[in-house]
């Protein structure tokens, strides 16, 4: 019933999809799709990029406005798909695991193959210092630890407090980075090298019936051809998690998936449907109908009845 549908942990069984295993983990017949090629940029480290962009990565949120101004002011040269600032509110006043997680995510952005060149923008007083961050970027680059932290002109580091005119210096750096990247050319690469990121479909009334099903079939076609697909927003997997678990390549991956689901979906401070209604649904309804007191009272009364001791099947 609705009262006991969710608990602190959920139990799952490792029942591999025999059809998928027998096919060598090809969920669908590819019918030659695996032989197709795409046009992409081959990076010096061997990775492929779909776009040839210049990225501005702030080490700290304090320079977000500077990053945005530089991205909006710089003139995009021929051969460059765009200049983008990846702003965020982090990089300072963080400690321990939170601080390291921020640094790791930002370093991986700098090393992303869609970024033909990168301007790393720091302030100077943040605890994610430009100097230490450059070392992390080098250690996490595909070339491995000890590689040139400027990656032969691909990365420029700018600390705004060390500059008398950070706008002029930033624009000059972006100009150099574009000169470095504008001669990159697309070439034919195998579809198997493609990495696709999935995004939430909006969670409307039809996404689980139409859009998600179609996207799933597309993912099957690509992964069966050797491509990689990354699923995001783990709570959206709720209800289909056992199906995904049945595709785990081994018991170890299955166990990690179960832990992920239990940690991010079920194992929260709100662990029953009644509590979800009380602490999540009701506030949302109140937000949208608070201007209509009569309608609000009717909704609240209905939900109060719904979350009573009565079982709902």
Put a short name on every predicted segment.
Residues 1-313:
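Metallocofactor- and cofactor-centric catalytic cores in central/energy metabolism, strongly enriched
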């Amino acid at each position: 019933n609705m009262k006991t549908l969710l608990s602190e942990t959920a139990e799952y069984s490792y029942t591999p999809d025999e059809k998928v295993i027998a096919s060598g983990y090809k969920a669908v017949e590819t019918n030659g799709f695996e032989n197709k090629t795409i046009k992409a940029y081959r990076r010096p480290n061997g990775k492929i990029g779909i776009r040839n962009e210049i990225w501005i990565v702030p080490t700290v949120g304090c320079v977000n406005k500077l990053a945005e101004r530089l991205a909006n002011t710089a003139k995009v040269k021929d051969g460059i798909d765009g200049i983008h600032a990846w702003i965020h509110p982090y990089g300072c006043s963080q400690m321990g695991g939170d601080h390291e997680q921020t640094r790791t995510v930002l370093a991986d952005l700098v090393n992303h193959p869609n970024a033909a060149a990168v301007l790393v923008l720091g302030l100077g007083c943040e605890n994610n210092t430009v100097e230490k961050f450059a070392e992390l970027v080098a250690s996490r680059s595909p070339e491995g630890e000890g590689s040139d932290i400027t990656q032969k002109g691909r990365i420029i580091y700018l600390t705004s407090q060390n500059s008398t005119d950070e706008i002029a210096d930033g624009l000059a750096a972006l100009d150099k980075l574009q000169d470095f990247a504008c001669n990159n050319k697309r070439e034919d690469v195998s579809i198997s090298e493609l990495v696709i990121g999935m995004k939430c479909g909006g969670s409307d009334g039809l996404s689980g019936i139409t859009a998600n099903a179609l996207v799933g079939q597309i993912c099957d076609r690509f992964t069966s051809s050797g491509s990689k697909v990354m699923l995001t927003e783990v709570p959206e997997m709720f209800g289909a998690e056992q199906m995904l678990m049945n595709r785990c390549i081994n018991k170890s991956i299955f166990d990690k998936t179960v832990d992920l689901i239990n940690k991010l979906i079920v194992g929260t401070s709100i662990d029953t449907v009644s509590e979800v209604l009380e602490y999540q649904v009701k506030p949302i309804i109140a937000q949208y109908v608070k201007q209509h007191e009569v309608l609000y009272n009717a909704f609240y009364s209905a939900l109060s009845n719904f979350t009573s001791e009565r079982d709902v099947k």
